[in-house]
């Protein structure tokens, strides 16, 4: 079966499996749902198991600690998708033959045999948990007893400066360009980059790396592009390389390097990439663009590396003001050039529907799960005077990497869901988003002042306070595991021990010195669990796949990572349409007509990008041709789908 789609005058022909052959096994997985009877039984059995454990006089203090740890993670397995315990839960419920998982708790409770049935199941689950806990204790004891002295040596991360001997041989000059959004700091650094013989730009986003690549090429500068998902070697000897920070080349010598958003080095999930760029780049001049909050931290690191250090400070090119009042919830007061900021995809589309109805016009949308190419298209619509999309609905994704003709930022809320709980938006993030107001004028005319306000009065005082708070200094630079040491550490242990437990032990033992901290976010540890027990997959392959850009809570992630791991282990050459874990049948629907279909297409696009990321690292196994075509089709459908929803 083939899907034919016309995009920009080119017909793509992509083979697909039949829907019946490509149903994703996890799409029917109900174990993550909280209201199903399987979870009711699980919770009851877990309570019984907990009571048994902590009533036992045989438990040592060490085992009591492990018991509490085991119970906590079992309890949260369905919420946080901790694979080791999540699989335990799923397997136990499945093995017990409890197949009637689609009925609600209420209907189960009303069934005649429910009370007897529940008691039997609870007892069996309790027994399985007890057996599993004993295995868990044995795993922990084996980990702790395996070469403890060598474990301590391999987790000693106290001197990351010495990890980069090539950079230590150079007398580098670190030059900081510090200022708020729209102060010209990055422009100044890029002007220096244009004049060097050999340079590199490293930024936080693929979209930004593309923008610099296109801009430099338009200026006649030979520039290549390196991102996690795409490599463009247009020139054998480029003057400049534009890349994302994770792809920064630390083994080549440059005259000038520019690292954007250097304050991100304190970020728990990706900060390690900025820190390793700062410590490891072999460049005579390193220009760092960022916020005042990171100056003291970088200065202290420059002193440790014995590099020269200079700071240039910049003021905004146009003023930024907080409005006199909020909009008091009146959508009719929104004007052309406004950007309404919401912190979830659901809230963005809810607001979009209300705003489009209230104003009788379409609005553009930008949020994190949209592909960069689609975000760029929506930004162009918003910036264009000939377009009808004169109001923008956006998430915090607008904080970096897009040139937007925003006149006024309107916060719809100052809270967001962190993945665990609802939190206040951090002050630096509020300031960064607010700074987008008045940031860019696509026509090159004089820039007007930027205005920032809130949609509702309840948030207005909080916004005022945030905008007037002084900058707080950052004190920590995140580092990741050193590859060779981490490889040796993982190699110490037997293959039958769940690698998640080994990872937990590694981070527990890891030791650093100020200002460096180890970031667990530097390793997508949930991925390692999907790769457990794949025959023929080496430890080096597993470490390499830890960077695969799949979302932790994606229902497609487990099967996708496992299938990629198996393919690599077997050395089997294939195209993306050969993978059962990639639901390409979504493309058969054509252009999405509902928000649900749009979201499903976004999830498919992320899987395609993850495949392309893996194909760059395993080009002899994972072929890229069909993936590039399906990616283009998905992006075209997304653009047209958003356009349909805007009508």
From Swiss-Prot:
Its EC number is 3.6.4.13. Residues 326-486 form the Helicase C-terminal domain. It holds the Pfam family DEXQc_Suv3. GO terms for cellular component: mitochondrial degradosome; mitochondrial matrix; mitochondrion. InterPro entries: DEXQc_SUV3 (IPR055206), Helicase_ATP-bd (IPR014001), Helicase_C-like (IPR001650), P-loop_NTPase (IPR027417), RNA-DNA_Helicase (IPR050699), SUV3_C (IPR022192), Suv3_DEXQc (IPR044774). The keyword Secreted does not apply. It catalyses: ATP + H2O = ADP + phosphate + H(+). GO terms for biological process: mitochondrial RNA 3'-end processing. Keywords: ATP-binding, Helicase, Hydrolase, Mitochondrion, Nucleotide-binding, RNA-binding, Transit peptide. It is found in: Mitochondrion matrix. CDD domains: DEXQc_Suv3, SF2_C_suv3. Belongs to the helicase family. PANTHER family: ATP-DEPENDENT RNA AND DNA HELICASE, ATP-DEPENDENT RNA HELICASE SUPV3L1, MITOCHONDRIAL-RELATED. This is ATP-dependent RNA helicase suv3, mitochondrial. The gene is suv3.
